[in-house]
Curated annotation (Swiss-Prot):
Protein name from the UniProt record: Methionine aminopeptidase 2
Binding-site residues for a divalent metal cation 1, renumbered to this chain: 203, 214, 413
Family as reported in the entry's similarity comment: Belongs to the peptidase M24A family. Methionine aminopeptidase eukaryotic type 2 subfamily.
Organism: Candida tropicalis (strain ATCC MYA-3404 / T1)
Main location: cytoplasm
Length: 432
């Protein structure tokens, strides 16, 4: 999902992370199995008149001039051997890890986890294709419901799983606008529409066998480049966090490096200079099987946390920048939920909430979900029972989190795998 929330409160390899379309190993088409760039390609088959070889006019057969939609097919059909594109490889930053690159023992250990890595790579390839479709299709005037359906239906079609727990959506699609930093997805009946001057964070989760790829980007439609600087600040801060991350690296050191880059930027609006701040109570996080926030948090400011990253862990490195207070609070109608872990001893307080809980377990397990997904799973008139589960600590709610009104926020995020010998930015693409 998006960042964990803490309510208590370069050249070099950074350049390597920037996309060179001639060198990227994770561009959307792979192994010559490219799909159309636009699954909604328009086919122009209107009637035309041509001359025959004798000069007589011949009328071409008139065909139906309708837009034809190309059906999205399972990602497996493009990779029948089950081997998916690798992400971007990077060496670990600390001197003590230099031996890992050439260690045969470390490479052997890495091969033992190959099924795990392939699950992540499959999810990442789905993610790249889905966001490619989103980036080419989303336009001002679309409703949030339309945008969410576009993204989520694409994930489901590419995953082509016979059960939500085998593969598919990793968490509700985040579509947070302007001062809303994270955890907004539309509930049924939401009338919110994307406007030309909005800045939208698009946070997409894809899982395969519970291995979650968590990656986010920011979209704008302002033709004057109003948001260019805040987007650049957050993108570069995320790249810095990825560069600094690695085995035995202290979490505080990553946050300190991110903050230095992020807060060196500012943007201008109507002649006024707006400093760009890290949203200090939002963090990256490690990812477990079927668990999006698995214990460790990766700060985006210096916070004194001396905890180290460890071999074999998976992290979502994400940063948020804001022109506001640089601090978020919950506000608005909740849409995001997840079952709490370690609460198996707690019992649902009513027969209806017991039925709802069983449906949640069957369809989502410990993966996050939203109200629209419950309705897709057949639930009706469930809000009272859902609120009971929340009050009893069985289900956790994640309402939208916002900075002050009138401010702007941006987000970029990638999932990284800490292999024994190198780190892999598995969700890297030719877009960001």
């Amino acid at each position: 999902m998006t960042a964990s929330v803490d309510t208590k409160t370069v050249e070099g390899q950074i350049n390597d992370l920037k996309i060179d379309s001639t060198e990227s190993s994770t561009t959307i088409p792979n192994n010559g199995k490219q799909e159309s760039d636009n699954e909604d390609d328009e086919v122009d088959e209107s009637s035309t008149t041509q001359l025959s070889s004798t000069g007589d006019k011949k009328k071409k057969k008139k065909k139906n001039n309708k837009k034809k939609k190309k059906k999205i097919v399972s990602i497996d059909s493009s990779y029948p051997d089950g081997v998916f594109p690798e992400g971007q490889w990077m060496e670990y930053p600390l001197e003590i890890n230099s031996y890992r690159t050439t260690s045969e023992e470390k490479r052997y250990l890495d091969r033992q986890e190959n099924n795990k890595w392939e699950d992540f790579r499959k999810g990442a390839e789905i993610h790249r294709r889905v966001r490619h479709k989103a980036q080419s299709s989303i336009k001002p005037g679309m409703s949030m419901i339309e945008i969410a359906d576009l993204i989520e239906d694409s994930v489901r079609n590419y995953a082509a799983a016979d059960h939500t727990l085998k593969a598919g959506i990793g968490f509700p699609t985040g579509l947070s606008l302007n001062h809303v930093a994270a955890h907004y997805t539309p509930n049924t009946g939401d009338k919110l529409v994307l406007n030309k001057d909005d800045i939208m964070k698009v946070d997409i989760g894809v899982h395969v066998n519970g291995r979650i790829c968590d990656s986010a980007f920011t979209m704008t439609f302002n033709e004057e480049g109003k948001y260019d600087k805040i987007m650049e600040a957050v993108r570069e801060a995320t790249y810095t966090g990825i560069k600094e991350a690695g085995i035995d690296v202290r979490l505080n050191d990553i946050g300190e490096a991110i903050q230095e880059v992020m807060e060196s930027y500012e943007m201008e609006e109507n002649g006024k200079i707006l400093p760009i701040k890290c949203i200090k109570n939002l963090n990256g996080h490690n990812i477990g099987d079927y668990v999006i926030h698995s214990g460790k948090t990766v700060p985006i400011v210096a916070n004194g946390d001396m905890t180290k990253m460890e071999e074999g862990e998976t992290f979502a490195i994400e940063t948020f920048g804001s022109t506001g207070n640089g601090y978020v609070l919950p506000e608005g109608e909740c849409s995001h939920y997840a079952m709490n872990t370690g609460v198996e001893h707690l019992k649902a307080p009513s027969e209806r909430s017991k039925q709802l809980l069983q449906n949640i377990k069957d369809n989502f397990g410990t993966l996050p979900w939203c109200r629209r997904y419950l309705e897709r799973a057949g639930e009706e008139k469930y809000l009272f029972a859902l609120n009971q589960l929340v009050r009893h600590g069985i289900v956790e709610e994640y309402p939208p989190i916002v900075d002050k009104r009138g401010s702007y926020t941006a987000q970029y995020e990638h999932t990284i795998l800490l292999h024994p010998h190198k780190k892999e930015v598995v969700t890297k693409g030719d877009d960001y």
